Amino acid sequence: MDVARDNNGSCVFFEQEDGRLCVIHREAGVDALPSACRHFPRKFLRDGRGTFVSLSHFCPTAAILLIGAETLEVVPAVPPLMLEEPIEGLDARDALPPLLCPDVLCDLDGYDAWERAAIAVLARPDLTCQRALDWIGAATERVRAWRPGGQSLTSAVAAAFANDAAQVPAPQLTQEEMVDLVWRLSDGRVPSDIEPIDRFEDRWNARVGPAFDRYDGAMKNYVAARIFANWIAYQGRGLRSIVQWGRAAAALVRHHTLRRMLDSGGSPGPDDVIEAIRMADLLLLHVIDTQAFARAVAPIEA
């Protein structure tokens, strides 16, 4: 079902000036909503482990929750978060498990252990988001060395994440390369504020710097949300691609935060971070093709 839009592109059933409510939802109930509206802000993944739901933080309420969350953990999804059938999303129930690297498959238990271990690193209060991503990347390099026939993949994941593995080189795209990649994949469907910022790190340090530290927990929560139940696991060529997906999420938040500071001349506040996260998820979950992202970062799996 399609719904009409006004001259500004907004849904004609959205009461912008009267409580910001949906007329269809109010008058006919959730079952009458178009599928995209019924599912938003949920993003579903279904595989051999079960049905998983994460949130699009383009939804302002979901984005605000990242700022105030004191703990980070995976919890069971219950109604109204979990929907009744039909559920739409990425259905990988009949697919092979995610790739460890281009020529080796994970098993589902091993992949689940890797995903949970990555989220556990992001939940650590003693690590910054950047440090956590580096830890995940380094541990993933050790996991990629696993081959069948010895210890289980689950055990290999536990061993790789148990100690600081930062000395293991982990290939990655730079901040500028990551933003440029997403900009190209957006194919002109977003405003020019996604264009890469020249001398990004210098300007970040001058305009944002330590003022962003108070929001580092929100950044870790956001990156964890993008790693949990991600689609890149089934669309990409290995675990490195998922790490790049997490790095892309962080890079876009940094980009949009700096862009707002360059425009305003101020210091970042909660509203700036919330809007930066919203714009990051708009791009990652609603604008670009995640399959195209997986193809674009595939060379890093070599």
Where are these regions (language model features)?
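Short, charged/polar micro-motifs that form catalytic or ligand-binding hotspots
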Residues: 27, 104, 239-243
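Generic alpha-helical scaffold signal
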Residues: 4-5, 31-34, 53, 243-247, ...
